[in-house]
Regions:
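Phosphate-coordination loops involved in phosphoryl transfer and adenosine-cofactor binding
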Residues: 5-8, 78-79
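Conserved hydrophobic helix-helix packing surfaces used for dimerization/oligomerization
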Residues: 8-9, 36
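Glycine-rich adenosine-cofactor-binding loop
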Residues: 9-23
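Gly/Ala-rich phosphate-binding loop of Rossmann-like dinucleotide-binding domains
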Residues: 22-30
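NAD(P)-binding Rossmann-fold cofactor-contacting core
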Residues: 30-50
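Conserved Rossmann-fold cofactor-binding substructure of NAD(P)-dependent oxidoreductases
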Residues: 62-75
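N-terminal Rossmann-like NAD(P) cofactor-binding module of classical short-chain dehydrogenase/reductase
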Residues: 80-84
Length: 86
């Protein structure tokens, strides 16, 4: 069952909790998988193979105080969702 949320979703962190959360987001929250971006400072793409094949994006990056506004403005805006699992 596809979700109804039409905005973008940014998930920070590629660990175990994120690995459990991403499939739930794809199944129940977002309408299209290309709405979902996962970000971690390490390459965790093998952990998200199914989500990436479905159209989600993985970005290697790190959100810090010095780049917070710049990074977040690229991936989320008003009405979007940021999930910090880092």
């Amino acid at each position: 069952m596809a979700g109804q949320f039409e905005g973008r979703v940014l998930v920070l962190g590629g660990g175990s909790v994120s690995q459990c959360t991403v499939p739930l987001l794809l199944e129940h929250i977002v309408k299209r998988s290309d709405q979902l971006t996962i970000m971690d400072f390490q390459d965790m793409t093998p952990r998200f193979e199914d989500a990436l094949k479905a159209g989600a994006q993985f970005v290697i990056g790190k959100v810090e105080q010095s780049n917070l506004a710049q990074i977040l403005s690229q991936y989320v805006s008003r009405g979007d969702v940021l999930i910090d699992l880092a």
